């Protein structure tokens, strides 16, 4: 997404996460392209939420530190958050579009909304319940 350096740690961790998310296919899920795109959509949104929660849960930083002055490794910011977050959310939605268009628009839109709302609710609860965030 950006020109940030990908470390060995992040490479191995992302591979592990992708393998973990594909685990249901081992247990009798029938693979198809729509299921694959759904897994990738979940992964992309997970990475965005995970990156943000680092600021919420890390005892060495505060949510007050979340901004372009202190978070120098995110080069581009839009509307108060890293541009990568907006790109990730949009890409996560785009990955659901083929299923939404081809299979069932109602179910596809419902899956997108559920994915976004569940992550928003859980992130909001984490911020509200974790005392270091404020």
Where are these regions (language model features)?
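Aromatic-rich, lipid-facing transmembrane alpha helices and their immediate juxtamembrane interface loops
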Residues: 1-134
């Amino acid at each position: 997404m950006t020109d940030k350096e990908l470390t060995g740690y992040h490479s191995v961790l992302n591979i592990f996460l992708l393998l973990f998310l594909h685990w249901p296919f081992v247990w009798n899920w029938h693979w198809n392209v729509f299921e694959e795109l759904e897994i990738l959509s979940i992964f992309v949104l997970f990475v965005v939420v995970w990156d943000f929660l680092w600021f919420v849960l890390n005892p060495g930083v505060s949510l007050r530190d979340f901004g372009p002055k202190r978070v120098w490794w995110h080069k581009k910011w839009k509307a108060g958050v890293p541009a990568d977050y907006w790109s990730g959310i949009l890409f996560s939605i785009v990955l659901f579009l083929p299923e939404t268009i081809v299979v069932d628009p109602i179910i596809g839109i419902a899956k997108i909304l559920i994915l976004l709302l569940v992550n928003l609710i859980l992130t909001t609860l984490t911020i509200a319940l974790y005392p270091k965030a404020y």
